[in-house]
Amino acid sequence: MIGLSNPELCYRFVRLSRLCCYIVVAFAVAFVGLTLAGAGFVFNFTHSVPFGLYKEISNPAKAPHTPAPYVFFCPDVRWPGMKGEPNYRKPMRTCPDGFAPLIKPVVAWPGDTVETSSQGVTVNGQLLANTLTVDRDSAGHPIRPYAYGTYYVQPGQLWVVSSFSPKSFDSRYFGPIPARSVRHWVQPFLVENQYHPASSTK
C-alpha cells in the first residue's frame, strides 16, 4: 500500500486539485458571463472607452441623446476611411469579417455638423476633449486622420469619437459609420473612470 507521503502520489494529487480548481473557475466564469449576457450586459476589455460592464439599451433614435450612448459596431475594411488603416481588432466571430466589434461613444447624429482639424473634433461648435490626431499608433504603425473639413451628418450616419482616450481609433481616423453597422446600443453600468496613458491605440 502506498501512502500519501509518497512524493509522486502527492505531486499527482496536487496537480489533480489544481485542475479541479481551474475547471470550477472556468465554469463559474462561463456561468456569470452567460447570465450577464442574458440580462443584456456586455463587458468591454478595450482601452478606448472605460473598462467595465455596459448595459444594453434600446435604439435611441430621437434626440436629445443624454447621456450619449455607446455603440458596439462592426467596421468594414471597404469603408473609404478604413482602407490602409491598421486592424486593432481581435479575432472573433461576432462580426461578418471574423473580428470583434469596436465600442465607441456616439458624438454626432444626423443633422449635426462635425468639423475635423489639427485642433481636434468639433461637434456643433463644441470642441471635444482628447481628440487630437496622431500620425503613428502606439506600436509605431503609420495612421492617417480622416480628411480635415466640415461635415454635415447625413441620415443613416453616426460619428463615434472617444474623449476618454486620446489614443482611441475612431471617427477621427475613419470618418462617419453607417448606423446599420451597429450591433448593440449600450450605456456604462459599472466602469472605471480614469484613462491609463500606457494603453495602446484601439
Predicted feature locations:
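Extended hydrophobic leader/signal-anchor segments used for secretion and membrane insertion
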Residues: I2-K202
